[in-house]
Protein backbone atom coordinates (compact mmCIF):
# COMPACT_ATOMS: atom_id res chain seq x y z
CA UNK A 1 0.00 0.00 0.00
CA UNK A 2 2.71 2.49 0.99
CA UNK A 3 4.82 4.14 -1.67
CA UNK A 4 8.62 3.78 -1.50
CA UNK A 5 10.67 6.45 0.21
CA UNK A 6 7.92 7.80 2.47
CA UNK A 7 9.05 10.45 5.00
CA UNK A 8 8.37 10.20 8.69
CA UNK A 9 5.32 12.21 9.85
CA UNK A 10 6.09 15.49 11.62
CA UNK A 11 4.80 16.94 14.84
CA UNK A 12 1.93 18.70 13.03
CA UNK A 13 0.29 15.50 11.88
CA UNK A 14 -2.43 16.19 14.43
CA UNK A 15 -3.82 18.90 12.13
CA UNK A 16 -5.77 16.12 10.46
CA UNK A 17 -7.90 15.80 13.59
CA UNK A 18 -9.77 19.08 12.90
CA UNK A 19 -13.25 18.91 11.38
CA UNK A 20 -13.61 18.80 7.63
CA UNK A 21 -15.44 22.14 7.48
CA UNK A 22 -12.24 23.88 8.56
CA UNK A 23 -10.47 22.71 5.42
CA UNK A 24 -13.37 22.71 2.97
CA UNK A 25 -12.98 24.31 -0.45
CA UNK A 26 -15.72 26.86 0.35
CA UNK A 27 -14.33 28.08 3.68
CA UNK A 28 -10.54 27.95 3.19
CA UNK A 29 -8.62 29.83 0.44
CA UNK A 30 -5.51 27.68 0.89
CA UNK A 31 -6.79 24.53 -0.81
CA UNK A 32 -7.49 23.92 -4.52
CA UNK A 33 -11.10 23.86 -5.66
CA UNK A 34 -12.96 23.63 -8.94
CA UNK A 35 -14.67 27.00 -8.61
CA UNK A 36 -11.42 28.90 -7.94
CA UNK A 37 -9.07 26.84 -10.12
CA UNK A 38 -6.28 27.23 -7.55
CA UNK A 39 -4.03 24.33 -8.49
CA UNK A 40 -0.31 23.78 -8.66
CA UNK A 41 1.50 22.97 -11.87
CA UNK A 42 2.82 19.51 -12.55
CA UNK A 43 6.43 20.65 -12.23
CA UNK A 44 5.75 22.16 -8.79
CA UNK A 45 4.06 18.96 -7.67
CA UNK A 46 7.04 16.89 -8.84
CA UNK A 47 9.47 19.19 -7.06
CA UNK A 48 7.48 18.92 -3.81
CA UNK A 49 7.27 15.13 -4.09
CA UNK A 50 11.02 14.97 -4.74
CA UNK A 51 11.57 17.06 -1.62
CA UNK A 52 9.49 14.51 0.33
CA UNK A 53 11.51 11.64 -1.27
CA UNK A 54 8.61 10.32 -3.32
CA UNK A 55 9.29 9.20 -6.90
CA UNK A 56 6.31 9.01 -9.27
CA UNK A 57 6.54 7.71 -12.86
CA UNK A 58 5.53 10.02 -15.69
CA UNK A 59 2.86 7.58 -16.82
CA UNK A 60 0.92 8.20 -13.61
CA UNK A 61 0.14 11.78 -14.69
CA UNK A 62 -1.14 10.65 -18.12
CA UNK A 63 -2.67 7.22 -17.52
CA UNK A 64 -2.82 6.52 -13.79
CA UNK A 65 -3.20 2.97 -12.58
CA UNK A 66 -5.17 1.90 -9.48
CA UNK A 67 -2.00 0.71 -7.69
CA UNK A 68 -0.31 4.08 -8.29
CA UNK A 69 -3.33 6.01 -6.98
CA UNK A 70 -3.43 3.78 -3.89
CA UNK A 71 0.26 4.45 -3.29
CA UNK A 72 -0.34 8.21 -3.61
CA UNK A 73 -3.21 8.04 -1.09
CA UNK A 74 -0.99 5.98 1.23
CA UNK A 75 1.72 8.66 1.06
CA UNK A 76 -0.84 11.38 1.83
CA UNK A 77 -2.29 9.42 4.77
CA UNK A 78 1.17 8.87 6.25
CA UNK A 79 2.24 12.50 5.73
CA UNK A 80 -0.97 14.14 7.01
CA UNK A 81 -2.43 11.67 9.51
CA UNK A 82 0.86 10.01 10.53
CA UNK A 83 -0.46 6.46 9.90
CA UNK A 84 1.81 3.86 8.28
CA UNK A 85 0.96 0.49 6.78
CA UNK A 86 1.58 -1.10 10.18
CA UNK A 87 -1.22 1.07 11.63
CA UNK A 88 -3.71 0.73 8.77
CA UNK A 89 -3.22 -2.95 7.96
CA UNK A 90 -2.06 -4.30 11.28
CA UNK A 91 -3.99 -7.55 10.77
CA UNK A 92 -2.11 -8.37 7.57
CA UNK A 93 1.26 -7.45 9.09
CA UNK A 94 0.86 -9.57 12.23
CA UNK A 95 -1.06 -12.34 10.49
CA UNK A 96 -3.87 -12.50 13.06
CA UNK A 97 -6.98 -10.57 14.03
CA UNK A 98 -7.25 -9.44 17.66
CA UNK A 99 -10.07 -7.90 19.60
CA UNK A 100 -9.78 -4.58 21.43
CA UNK A 101 -12.56 -5.49 23.88
CA UNK A 102 -11.40 -6.29 27.42
CA UNK A 103 -13.95 -9.10 27.73
CA UNK A 104 -12.17 -11.13 25.02
CA UNK A 105 -8.87 -10.56 26.82
CA UNK A 106 -7.10 -9.41 23.61
CA UNK A 107 -6.88 -12.93 22.20
CA UNK A 108 -7.58 -14.25 18.72
CA UNK A 109 -11.31 -14.45 18.10
CA UNK A 110 -11.22 -15.69 14.48
CA UNK A 111 -10.48 -19.21 13.31
CA UNK A 112 -8.02 -20.17 10.59
CA UNK A 113 -10.73 -19.72 7.97
CA UNK A 114 -11.82 -16.44 9.52
CA UNK A 115 -8.37 -14.94 9.11
CA UNK A 116 -9.22 -14.37 5.48
CA UNK A 117 -11.20 -11.35 6.69
CA UNK A 118 -8.00 -9.58 7.81
CA UNK A 119 -7.47 -8.09 4.37
CA UNK A 120 -11.08 -6.91 4.24
CA UNK A 121 -10.69 -5.17 7.60
CA UNK A 122 -7.57 -3.39 6.38
CA UNK A 123 -9.30 -2.35 3.14
CA UNK A 124 -12.27 -0.91 5.05
CA UNK A 125 -9.99 1.07 7.36
CA UNK A 126 -8.01 2.36 4.35
CA UNK A 127 -11.19 3.47 2.52
CA UNK A 128 -12.45 5.35 5.60
CA UNK A 129 -9.10 7.13 5.88
CA UNK A 130 -9.33 8.08 2.20
CA UNK A 131 -12.81 9.55 2.77
CA UNK A 132 -11.56 11.50 5.75
CA UNK A 133 -8.55 12.72 3.73
CA UNK A 134 -10.81 14.05 0.93
CA UNK A 135 -12.89 15.94 3.48
CA UNK A 136 -9.77 17.44 5.04
CA UNK A 137 -8.39 18.50 1.65
CA UNK A 138 -11.71 20.02 0.55
CA UNK A 139 -12.06 17.60 -2.38
CA UNK A 140 -15.25 15.89 -3.59
CA UNK A 141 -16.52 12.90 -1.65
CA UNK A 142 -14.33 9.82 -2.05
CA UNK A 143 -15.75 6.79 -3.83
CA UNK A 144 -14.36 3.47 -4.97
CA UNK A 145 -14.41 4.72 -8.56
CA UNK A 146 -11.39 6.83 -7.60
CA UNK A 147 -9.35 3.62 -7.43
CA UNK A 148 -11.27 1.58 -9.98
CA UNK A 149 -11.11 4.10 -12.87
CA UNK A 150 -8.73 6.95 -11.95
CA UNK A 151 -8.37 9.99 -14.18
CA UNK A 152 -5.31 12.15 -14.79
CA UNK A 153 -7.12 15.34 -13.78
CA UNK A 154 -8.36 13.82 -10.52
CA UNK A 155 -4.89 12.52 -9.62
CA UNK A 156 -3.28 15.89 -10.38
CA UNK A 157 -5.94 17.72 -8.37
CA UNK A 158 -5.42 15.39 -5.40
CA UNK A 159 -1.63 15.75 -5.59
CA UNK A 160 -1.97 19.54 -5.78
CA UNK A 161 -4.22 19.58 -2.70
CA UNK A 162 -1.77 17.41 -0.75
CA UNK A 163 1.20 19.62 -1.67
CA UNK A 164 -0.75 22.77 -0.76
CA UNK A 165 -1.69 21.32 2.63
CA UNK A 166 1.90 20.30 3.34
CA UNK A 167 3.13 23.77 2.36
CA UNK A 168 0.49 25.42 4.54
CA UNK A 169 1.37 23.21 7.48
CA UNK A 170 5.07 23.99 7.19
CA UNK A 171 4.49 27.74 6.84
CA UNK A 172 2.09 27.89 9.80
CA UNK A 173 4.50 25.88 11.90
CA UNK A 174 7.39 28.20 11.11
CA UNK A 175 5.32 31.37 11.47
CA UNK A 176 3.34 30.84 14.66
CA UNK A 177 5.19 28.23 16.70
CA UNK A 178 7.25 30.69 18.75
CA UNK A 179 4.29 33.07 19.19
CA UNK A 180 2.01 30.30 20.40
CA UNK A 181 4.56 29.09 22.92
CA UNK A 182 5.19 32.65 24.13
CA UNK A 183 1.46 33.38 24.42
CA UNK A 184 0.84 30.20 26.41
CA UNK A 185 3.67 31.01 28.82
CA UNK A 186 2.39 34.60 29.24
CA UNK A 187 -1.15 33.39 29.93
CA UNK A 188 0.07 31.01 32.58
CA UNK A 189 2.19 33.67 34.26
CA UNK A 190 -0.67 36.22 34.07
CA UNK A 191 -3.12 33.77 35.60
CA UNK A 192 -0.72 33.00 38.42
CA UNK A 193 -0.11 36.72 39.06
CA UNK A 194 -3.83 37.53 39.10
CA UNK A 195 -4.54 34.71 41.51
CA UNK A 196 -1.71 35.79 43.78
CA UNK A 197 -2.90 39.44 43.67
CA UNK A 198 -6.46 38.47 44.57
CA UNK A 199 -5.27 36.36 47.45
CA UNK A 200 -3.04 39.16 48.74
CA UNK A 201 -5.84 41.75 48.51
CA UNK A 202 -8.29 39.52 50.31
CA UNK A 203 -5.83 38.82 53.09
CA UNK A 204 -4.97 42.53 53.39
CA UNK A 205 -8.62 43.62 53.70
CA UNK A 206 -9.39 40.92 56.21
CA UNK A 207 -6.41 41.74 58.40
CA UNK A 208 -7.11 45.51 58.29
CA UNK A 209 -10.73 44.97 59.36
CA UNK A 210 -9.88 42.65 62.23
CA UNK A 211 -6.64 44.21 63.45
CA UNK A 212 -8.13 47.04 65.57
CA UNK A 213 -10.97 45.11 67.19
CA UNK A 214 -9.68 41.55 67.45
CA UNK A 215 -5.93 41.75 67.92
CA UNK A 216 -5.74 38.96 70.56
CA UNK A 217 -8.19 36.85 68.62
CA UNK A 218 -6.15 37.45 65.47
CA UNK A 219 -3.05 36.17 67.22
CA UNK A 220 -4.85 33.05 68.36
CA UNK A 221 -6.33 32.54 64.92
CA UNK A 222 -2.92 33.04 63.35
CA UNK A 223 -1.47 30.37 65.60
CA UNK A 224 -4.40 28.10 64.86
CA UNK A 225 -4.03 28.85 61.16
CA UNK A 226 -0.38 27.83 61.26
CA UNK A 227 -1.38 24.60 62.97
CA UNK A 228 -4.09 23.98 60.41
CA UNK A 229 -1.68 24.74 57.56
CA UNK A 230 0.80 22.32 59.03
CA UNK A 231 -1.90 19.69 59.29
CA UNK A 232 -3.04 20.54 55.76
CA UNK A 233 0.50 20.06 54.48
CA UNK A 234 0.63 16.74 56.25
CA UNK A 235 -2.68 15.78 54.67
CA UNK A 236 -1.36 16.91 51.29
CA UNK A 237 1.76 14.83 51.80
CA UNK A 238 -0.43 11.87 52.75
CA UNK A 239 -2.58 12.49 49.69
CA UNK A 240 0.57 12.67 47.56
CA UNK A 241 1.74 9.38 49.03
CA UNK A 242 -1.63 7.83 48.23
CA UNK A 243 -1.50 9.22 44.69
CA UNK A 244 2.01 7.87 44.23
CA UNK A 245 0.89 4.50 45.48
CA UNK A 246 -2.07 4.66 43.09
CA UNK A 247 0.27 5.54 40.21
CA UNK A 248 2.58 2.71 41.21
CA UNK A 249 -0.34 0.33 41.18
CA UNK A 250 -1.37 1.66 37.80
CA UNK A 251 2.19 1.13 36.59
CA UNK A 252 2.13 -2.39 38.04
CA UNK A 253 -1.21 -2.90 36.30
CA UNK A 254 0.31 -1.74 32.99
CA UNK A 255 3.35 -3.95 33.48
CA UNK A 256 1.10 -6.88 34.24
CA UNK A 257 -0.85 -6.22 31.05
CA UNK A 258 2.39 -6.03 29.06
CA UNK A 259 3.70 -9.18 30.69
CA UNK A 260 0.38 -10.87 30.00
CA UNK A 261 0.67 -9.91 26.35
CA UNK A 262 4.25 -11.18 26.30
CA UNK A 263 3.10 -14.43 27.88
CA UNK A 264 0.35 -14.77 25.30
CA UNK A 265 2.89 -14.23 22.52
CA UNK A 266 5.29 -16.65 24.19
CA UNK A 267 2.48 -19.18 24.52
CA UNK A 268 1.70 -18.81 20.84
CA UNK A 269 5.38 -19.23 20.00
CA UNK A 270 5.53 -22.31 22.21
CA UNK A 271 2.43 -23.69 20.53
CA UNK A 272 3.98 -23.10 17.12
CA UNK A 273 7.27 -24.63 18.24
CA UNK A 274 5.37 -27.59 19.70
CA UNK A 275 3.57 -28.07 16.39
CA UNK A 276 6.88 -27.94 14.55
CA UNK A 277 8.43 -30.42 16.98
CA UNK A 278 5.32 -32.56 16.73
CA UNK A 279 5.67 -32.55 12.95
CA UNK A 280 9.31 -33.52 13.31
CA UNK A 281 8.45 -36.24 15.79
CA UNK A 282 5.72 -37.55 13.48
CA UNK A 283 7.93 -37.64 10.38
CA UNK A 284 11.17 -38.87 11.95
CA UNK A 285 9.84 -42.41 12.74
CA UNK A 286 8.98 -42.83 9.09
CA UNK A 287 12.50 -41.86 8.16
CA UNK A 288 13.82 -44.28 10.75
CA UNK A 289 11.58 -47.03 9.37
CA UNK A 290 12.83 -46.27 5.88
CA UNK A 291 16.41 -46.34 7.16
CA UNK A 292 15.72 -49.62 8.94
CA UNK A 293 14.23 -51.07 5.77
CA UNK A 294 17.26 -49.90 3.83
CA UNK A 295 19.54 -51.47 6.42
CA UNK A 296 17.51 -54.68 6.27
CA UNK A 297 17.83 -54.72 2.49
CA UNK A 298 21.53 -54.03 2.84
CA UNK A 299 21.77 -56.80 5.46
CA UNK A 300 19.96 -59.18 3.14
CA UNK A 301 22.34 -58.20 0.39
CA UNK A 302 25.29 -58.81 2.70
CA UNK A 303 23.74 -62.10 3.84
CA UNK A 304 23.40 -63.05 0.20
CA UNK A 305 27.02 -62.14 -0.38
CA UNK A 306 27.99 -64.13 2.73
CA UNK A 307 25.96 -67.08 1.44
CA UNK A 308 27.68 -66.75 -1.90
CA UNK A 309 31.03 -66.67 -0.14
CA UNK A 310 30.06 -69.73 1.90
CA UNK A 311 28.99 -71.47 -1.29
CA UNK A 312 32.25 -70.41 -2.84
CA UNK A 313 34.12 -71.78 0.18
CA UNK A 314 32.16 -75.03 -0.08
CA UNK A 315 32.98 -75.23 -3.76
CA UNK A 316 36.59 -74.53 -2.92
CA UNK A 317 36.43 -77.29 -0.32
CA UNK A 318 35.00 -79.57 -2.94
CA UNK A 319 37.74 -78.49 -5.24
CA UNK A 320 40.23 -79.22 -2.49
CA UNK A 321 38.76 -82.68 -2.05
CA UNK A 322 38.83 -83.16 -5.76
CA UNK A 323 42.31 -81.78 -5.77
CA UNK A 324 43.27 -84.23 -3.03
CA UNK A 325 41.87 -87.03 -5.11
CA UNK A 326 43.72 -85.60 -8.05
CA UNK A 327 46.82 -85.40 -5.93
CA UNK A 328 46.41 -89.01 -5.00
CA UNK A 329 45.98 -89.82 -8.58
CA UNK A 330 48.93 -87.61 -9.34
CA UNK A 331 50.92 -89.43 -6.72
CA UNK A 332 50.02 -92.63 -8.35
CA UNK A 333 50.96 -91.05 -11.61
CA UNK A 334 54.10 -89.77 -10.05
CA UNK A 335 54.80 -93.19 -8.77
CA UNK A 336 54.17 -94.40 -12.25
CA UNK A 337 56.24 -91.61 -13.67
CA UNK A 338 58.87 -91.64 -10.99
CA UNK A 339 60.51 -94.49 -12.53
CA UNK A 340 60.40 -92.66 -15.78
CA UNK A 341 61.51 -89.44 -14.07
CA UNK A 342 64.11 -91.31 -12.22
CA UNK A 343 65.02 -92.67 -15.40
CA UNK A 344 64.46 -89.53 -17.47
CA UNK A 345 64.29 -86.47 -15.13
CA UNK A 346 65.58 -85.74 -11.80
CA UNK A 347 63.12 -87.09 -9.25
CA UNK A 348 63.25 -84.06 -6.95
CA UNK A 349 62.45 -81.34 -9.55
CA UNK A 350 58.88 -82.42 -10.08
CA UNK A 351 58.11 -82.89 -6.41
CA UNK A 352 59.54 -79.41 -5.46
CA UNK A 353 57.50 -77.56 -8.05
CA UNK A 354 54.35 -79.39 -6.94
CA UNK A 355 54.83 -78.45 -3.29
CA UNK A 356 55.40 -74.77 -4.12
CA UNK A 357 52.17 -74.68 -6.06
CA UNK A 358 50.14 -76.23 -3.22
CA UNK A 359 51.63 -73.88 -0.60
CA UNK A 360 50.72 -70.83 -2.70
CA UNK A 361 47.17 -72.09 -3.11
CA UNK A 362 46.78 -72.70 0.63
CA UNK A 363 47.97 -69.12 1.40
CA UNK A 364 45.47 -67.58 -1.01
CA UNK A 365 42.60 -69.58 0.49
CA UNK A 366 43.56 -68.47 4.04
CA UNK A 367 43.67 -64.80 3.06
CA UNK A 368 40.23 -65.01 1.43
CA UNK A 369 38.77 -66.67 4.55
CA UNK A 370 40.17 -63.94 6.84
CA UNK A 371 38.75 -61.16 4.64
CA UNK A 372 35.28 -62.77 4.66
CA UNK A 373 35.24 -63.18 8.45
CA UNK A 374 36.34 -59.54 8.92
CA UNK A 375 33.56 -58.29 6.60
CA UNK A 376 30.98 -60.28 8.60
CA UNK A 377 32.20 -58.70 11.88
CA UNK A 378 32.03 -55.16 10.41
CA UNK A 379 28.44 -55.70 9.26
CA UNK A 380 27.41 -56.96 12.70
CA UNK A 381 29.05 -53.93 14.42
CA UNK A 382 27.29 -51.51 12.05
CA UNK A 383 23.97 -53.20 12.74
CA UNK A 384 24.45 -52.84 16.52
CA UNK A 385 25.44 -49.14 16.13
CA UNK A 386 22.30 -48.38 14.12
CA UNK A 387 20.15 -50.08 16.74
CA UNK A 388 21.75 -47.96 19.50
CA UNK A 389 21.20 -44.75 17.49
CA UNK A 390 17.52 -45.62 17.02
CA UNK A 391 17.08 -46.16 20.77
CA UNK A 392 18.85 -42.84 21.58
CA UNK A 393 16.62 -40.91 19.20
CA UNK A 394 13.47 -42.41 20.68
CA UNK A 395 14.65 -41.59 24.22
CA UNK A 396 15.50 -37.99 23.26
CA UNK A 397 12.10 -37.60 21.64
CA UNK A 398 10.35 -38.72 24.84
CA UNK A 399 12.48 -36.40 27.01
CA UNK A 400 11.83 -33.35 24.78
CA UNK A 401 8.11 -34.03 24.72
CA UNK A 402 8.03 -34.30 28.53
CA UNK A 403 10.00 -31.05 28.90
CA UNK A 404 7.70 -29.18 26.50
CA UNK A 405 4.64 -30.39 28.38
CA UNK A 406 6.18 -29.14 31.65
CA UNK A 407 6.94 -25.70 30.13
CA UNK A 408 3.39 -25.45 28.81
CA UNK A 409 1.89 -26.32 32.20
CA UNK A 410 4.09 -23.75 34.00
CA UNK A 411 3.18 -21.07 31.48
CA UNK A 412 -0.53 -21.79 31.99
CA UNK A 413 -0.17 -21.56 35.78
CA UNK A 414 1.70 -18.25 35.52
CA UNK A 415 -0.99 -16.82 33.23
CA UNK A 416 -3.75 -17.84 35.68
CA UNK A 417 -1.87 -16.30 38.62
CA UNK A 418 -1.33 -13.03 36.77
CA UNK A 419 -5.01 -12.90 35.79
CA UNK A 420 -6.02 -13.32 39.45
CA UNK A 421 -3.59 -10.60 40.56
CA UNK A 422 -4.94 -8.26 37.87
CA UNK A 423 -8.52 -8.86 39.01
CA UNK A 424 -7.56 -8.09 42.63
CA UNK A 425 -5.89 -4.83 41.55
CA UNK A 426 -9.01 -3.79 39.61
CA UNK A 427 -11.27 -4.51 42.61
CA UNK A 428 -9.03 -2.48 44.93
CA UNK A 429 -8.98 0.46 42.49
CA UNK A 430 -12.78 0.41 42.20
CA UNK A 431 -13.09 0.38 46.01
CA UNK A 432 -10.81 3.43 46.27
CA UNK A 433 -12.90 5.31 43.71
CA UNK A 434 -16.15 4.49 45.52
CA UNK A 435 -14.74 5.68 48.84
CA UNK A 436 -13.57 8.94 47.23
CA UNK A 437 -17.08 9.56 45.84
CA UNK A 438 -18.59 8.94 49.29
CA UNK A 439 -16.17 11.43 50.84
CA UNK A 440 -17.13 14.09 48.29
CA UNK A 441 -20.85 13.52 48.96
CA UNK A 442 -20.36 13.81 52.74
CA UNK A 443 -18.33 16.99 52.32
CA UNK A 444 -21.08 18.55 50.19
CA UNK A 445 -23.71 17.64 52.82
CA UNK A 446 -21.52 19.15 55.58
CA UNK A 447 -21.14 22.40 53.60
CA UNK A 448 -24.92 22.60 53.09
CA UNK A 449 -25.57 22.10 56.82
CA UNK A 450 -23.02 24.80 57.70
CA UNK A 451 -24.64 27.20 55.25
CA UNK A 452 -28.08 26.65 56.79
CA UNK A 453 -26.62 27.14 60.28
CA UNK A 454 -24.95 30.43 59.27
CA UNK A 455 -28.22 31.73 57.77
CA UNK A 456 -30.13 30.89 60.96
CA UNK A 457 -27.48 32.58 63.14
CA UNK A 458 -27.60 35.72 60.97
CA UNK A 459 -31.39 35.90 61.38
CA UNK A 460 -31.04 35.57 65.18
CA UNK A 461 -28.36 38.30 65.18
CA UNK A 462 -30.70 40.64 63.30
CA UNK A 463 -33.46 40.00 65.86
CA UNK A 464 -31.15 40.52 68.85
CA UNK A 465 -29.68 43.66 67.28
CA UNK A 466 -33.17 45.15 66.71
CA UNK A 467 -34.21 44.33 70.28
CA UNK A 468 -30.99 45.83 71.62
CA UNK A 469 -31.51 49.08 69.69
CA UNK A 470 -35.05 49.37 71.06
CA UNK A 471 -33.86 48.64 74.55
CA UNK A 472 -31.05 51.21 74.47
CA UNK A 473 -33.42 53.91 73.18
CA UNK A 474 -35.85 53.12 76.01
CA UNK A 475 -32.97 53.23 78.48
CA UNK A 476 -31.88 56.67 77.30
CA UNK A 477 -35.46 57.93 77.54
CA UNK A 478 -35.80 56.56 81.09
CA UNK A 479 -32.46 58.09 82.08
CA UNK A 480 -33.69 61.46 80.92
CA UNK A 481 -36.88 61.04 83.01
CA UNK A 482 -35.13 59.89 86.20
CA UNK A 483 -34.82 62.29 89.20
CA UNK A 484 -31.30 63.59 89.71
CA UNK A 485 -31.22 62.99 93.51
CA UNK A 486 -31.60 59.20 93.23
CA UNK A 487 -28.62 56.99 93.89
CA UNK A 488 -27.61 54.02 91.76
CA UNK A 489 -29.72 51.41 93.57
CA UNK A 490 -32.81 53.63 93.43
CA UNK A 491 -32.13 54.35 89.77
CA UNK A 492 -31.89 50.67 89.02
CA UNK A 493 -35.14 49.92 90.93
CA UNK A 494 -36.87 52.84 89.23
CA UNK A 495 -35.63 51.59 85.88
CA UNK A 496 -36.95 48.12 86.53
CA UNK A 497 -40.36 49.41 87.74
CA UNK A 498 -40.67 51.87 84.87
CA UNK A 499 -39.73 49.22 82.33
CA UNK A 500 -42.26 46.81 83.82
CA UNK A 501 -44.99 49.41 83.72
CA UNK A 502 -44.34 50.79 80.28
CA UNK A 503 -43.55 47.58 78.43
CA UNK A 504 -45.80 45.07 80.10
CA UNK A 505 -47.47 42.87 77.53
CA UNK A 506 -44.89 43.74 74.86
CA UNK A 507 -43.46 40.83 72.71
CA UNK A 508 -39.92 41.88 73.58
CA UNK A 509 -40.54 42.01 77.33
CA UNK A 510 -38.90 38.67 78.01
CA UNK A 511 -35.78 39.58 76.13
CA UNK A 512 -35.53 42.93 77.90
CA UNK A 513 -35.93 41.29 81.30
CA UNK A 514 -33.00 39.03 80.46
CA UNK A 515 -30.83 42.08 79.71
CA UNK A 516 -31.59 43.96 82.99
CA UNK A 517 -28.23 42.99 84.42
CA UNK A 518 -26.45 44.38 81.38
CA UNK A 519 -28.37 47.72 81.68
CA UNK A 520 -27.53 47.92 85.36
CA UNK A 521 -23.86 47.58 84.54
CA UNK A 522 -24.24 50.34 81.92
CA UNK A 523 -25.85 52.60 84.55
CA UNK A 524 -23.04 51.86 86.99
CA UNK A 525 -20.38 52.76 84.41
CA UNK A 526 -22.18 55.90 83.30
CA UNK A 527 -22.88 57.21 86.94
CA UNK A 528 -20.91 60.22 88.30
CA UNK A 529 -17.97 59.76 90.68
CA UNK A 530 -19.72 61.34 93.73
CA UNK A 531 -23.28 62.09 94.73
CA UNK A 532 -22.39 65.61 95.86
CA UNK A 533 -21.30 66.67 92.36
CA UNK A 534 -24.25 65.03 90.62
CA UNK A 535 -25.76 68.15 89.25
CA UNK A 536 -22.47 69.63 88.08
CA UNK A 537 -21.43 66.43 86.30
CA UNK A 538 -24.83 65.63 84.82
CA UNK A 539 -24.22 67.23 81.40
CA UNK A 540 -20.91 65.40 81.15
CA UNK A 541 -22.07 61.99 82.46
CA UNK A 542 -24.97 61.74 80.07
CA UNK A 543 -22.80 62.14 76.94
CA UNK A 544 -20.32 59.69 78.46
CA UNK A 545 -23.08 57.12 78.98
CA UNK A 546 -24.34 57.75 75.47
CA UNK A 547 -20.83 57.26 74.08
CA UNK A 548 -20.47 54.06 76.11
CA UNK A 549 -23.78 52.81 74.78
CA UNK A 550 -22.82 53.67 71.23
CA UNK A 551 -19.48 51.91 71.63
CA UNK A 552 -21.15 48.80 73.05
CA UNK A 553 -23.74 49.05 70.30
CA UNK A 554 -20.96 49.14 67.72
CA UNK A 555 -19.37 46.09 69.31
CA UNK A 556 -22.64 44.19 68.84
CA UNK A 557 -23.31 45.43 65.27
CA UNK A 558 -24.50 42.86 62.65
CA UNK A 559 -21.44 43.42 60.47
CA UNK A 560 -19.01 42.45 63.21
CA UNK A 561 -21.29 39.64 64.25
CA UNK A 562 -21.25 38.33 60.70
CA UNK A 563 -17.47 38.56 60.62
CA UNK A 564 -17.20 36.65 63.89
CA UNK A 565 -19.65 34.04 62.61
CA UNK A 566 -17.80 33.75 59.29
CA UNK A 567 -14.52 33.17 61.12
CA UNK A 568 -16.15 30.66 63.44
CA UNK A 569 -17.83 29.00 60.46
CA UNK A 570 -14.52 28.69 58.62
CA UNK A 571 -12.86 27.22 61.68
CA UNK A 572 -15.74 24.82 62.30
CA UNK A 573 -15.85 23.77 58.66
CA UNK A 574 -12.08 23.20 58.51
CA UNK A 575 -12.15 21.18 61.76
CA UNK A 576 -15.10 19.12 60.53
CA UNK A 577 -13.33 18.49 57.24
CA UNK A 578 -10.15 17.41 59.02
CA UNK A 579 -12.07 15.10 61.37
CA UNK A 580 -14.01 13.66 58.46
CA UNK A 581 -10.81 12.95 56.52
CA UNK A 582 -9.23 11.35 59.55
CA UNK A 583 -12.25 9.11 60.11
CA UNK A 584 -12.37 8.11 56.43
CA UNK A 585 -8.62 7.44 56.28
CA UNK A 586 -8.84 5.40 59.51
CA UNK A 587 -11.74 3.46 58.10
CA UNK A 588 -10.09 2.85 54.71
CA UNK A 589 -6.58 2.19 55.97
CA UNK A 590 -6.74 0.91 59.54
CA UNK A 591 -3.29 -0.63 59.26
CA UNK A 592 -1.77 2.62 58.03
CA UNK A 593 -2.41 4.43 61.35
CA UNK A 594 -0.54 1.82 63.37
CA UNK A 595 3.15 2.78 63.66
CA UNK A 596 5.77 0.19 62.86
CA UNK A 597 8.74 -0.72 65.03
CA UNK A 598 10.83 2.14 63.58
CA UNK A 599 8.08 4.68 64.40
CA UNK A 600 7.03 5.23 60.79
CA UNK A 601 3.57 4.97 59.25
CA UNK A 602 3.72 2.47 56.38
CA UNK A 603 0.94 4.07 54.33
CA UNK A 604 1.88 7.75 54.43
CA UNK A 605 5.64 7.61 54.78
CA UNK A 606 7.72 9.70 57.21
CA UNK A 607 6.09 12.61 58.88
CA UNK A 608 7.58 15.97 58.07
Curated annotation (Swiss-Prot):
Recorded family membership: Belongs to the NUF2 family.
Keyword Phosphoprotein: no
Lineage: Eukaryota, Sar, Alveolata, Apicomplexa, Conoidasida
Protein's UniProt keywords contain Chaperone: no
Native species: Toxoplasma gondii (strain ATCC 50611 / Me49)
GO cellular component: Ndc80 complex
Pfam families tied to this protein: Nuf2
Phenotype when the gene is knocked out: Conditional knockdown results in parasite inability to form plaques, indicating an essential role for parasite survival. Dissociation of centrosomes from the nucleus. Increase in centrosome inner and outer core dissociation. Disappearance of NDC80 from the kinetochore. Nuclei segregation defects. Chromosome segregation defects. No significant effects on centromere clustering. No significant effects on apicoplast segregation.
Main location: nucleus
Gene3D superfamilies xrefs: Ncd80 complex, Nuf2 subunit
Entry's localization field: Chromosome, Centromere, Kinetochore
Protein purpose: Required for anchoring centrosomal cores to the nuclear periphery. Plays a role in chromosome segregation but is dispensable for centromere clustering.
Keyword vocabulary terms for this entry: Cell cycle, Cell division, Centromere, Chromosome, Coiled coil, Kinetochore, Mitosis
GO biological process assignments: cell division
Residue ranges the record marks as coiled coil: 176-319, 358-460
Listed name of the protein: Kinetochore protein NUF2
Region of interest (Required for nuclear localization and function), ranges: 121-125
Amino acid sequence: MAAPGLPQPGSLSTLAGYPSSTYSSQNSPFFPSADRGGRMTLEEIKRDFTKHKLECPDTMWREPQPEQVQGLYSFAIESIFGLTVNDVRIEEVTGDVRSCLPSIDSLQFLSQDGRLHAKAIGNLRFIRLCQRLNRVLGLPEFSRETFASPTASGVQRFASAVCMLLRLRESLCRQFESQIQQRASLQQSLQKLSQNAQLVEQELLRFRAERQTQQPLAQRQKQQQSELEEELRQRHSELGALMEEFKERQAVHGRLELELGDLVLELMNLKQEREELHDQVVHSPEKLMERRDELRVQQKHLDAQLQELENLAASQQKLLLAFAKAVKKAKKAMEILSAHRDQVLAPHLGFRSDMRTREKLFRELGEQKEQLSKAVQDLQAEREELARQLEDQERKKDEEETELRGHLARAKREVEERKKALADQQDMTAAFLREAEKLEEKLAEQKQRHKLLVDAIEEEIQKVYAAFLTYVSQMQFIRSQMPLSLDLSQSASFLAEHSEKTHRGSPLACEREENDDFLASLLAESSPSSLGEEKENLPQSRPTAAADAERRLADFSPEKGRKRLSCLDEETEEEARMHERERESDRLFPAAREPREDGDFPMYGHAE
